[in-house]
Amino acid sequence: MAVVVQLTDHDGDVPPVLAVAPMIDGLTSGQNMFSCEGDVVTMPSFQATYPNASRDNGLDANVGTMVLQRWDLSTGQRTIIPVVDAEGGAIELNEERTIHLYEGIQVGNEYRFISANGDAFAVDVTSGQGRYLFSIPSRSRDHSTVFQVSATGVYALEDRGDDRVVTLFYRPWDGEEQRELFTTSDLGRYLKGTALTGQMDIQSFALRPGWDGGAQ
């Protein structure tokens, strides 16, 4: 069963339940962000092609398509909308191209987001028409990258594992090439850690509200 609850002030020990819907095999969100307009919450989600995949049957649990879960909190109803491209084909997902733990922003009717894996998409939350935009490698043997987004593009903070030099890149949603904004080694001493702490990892970062310097 899928449930939407309200975590603000409530009466008693149990938060109010806003919506309930039956669990659908193979449907997962894996998100901590969503589009919200009025009483309607919309969340890009993953629908597995093989919900019963296991090592025993040889089916791949990572193969599936993108859908939108749309929750109308005024009625408590959920609608599942397949996400399709301009030709009407499904937006396919797999181990190499994911939407898991995305950072997203709504611009008009379009929800733009990039997954923790570095795959960027845009989806019209009204029609369900979507498009794959680009990918930015998020992790390799010698670096790791975390993302933030603005209305104009993606900010990627890369931590180089060997010397812990940190670089901020920017790439517009419209597909222009990625460009470097700045590089610093000032965090190196902290990230390398100590005998007590071990090495540190950058889990996330924030953009100053209203700042969109990469677009300038």
Language model regions located:
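Beta-propeller blade signature
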Residues: M1-D11, N57-G76, A120-D124, T167-G175
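Repeated scaffold domains used in trafficking and secretory/extracellular systems
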Residues: V17-G38, V83-V107, P137-T152, D186-Q216
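Exposed regions on extracellular, virion, or secretory-pathway luminal proteins
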Residues: Q129, R141, G161-D162, D174-E176
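Surface-exposed beta-loop interaction hotspot
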Residues: D56-D60, M66, L73-L101, Y111
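Extracytoplasmic/lumenal domain signature
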Residues: G76-I81, G128, T167-Q199
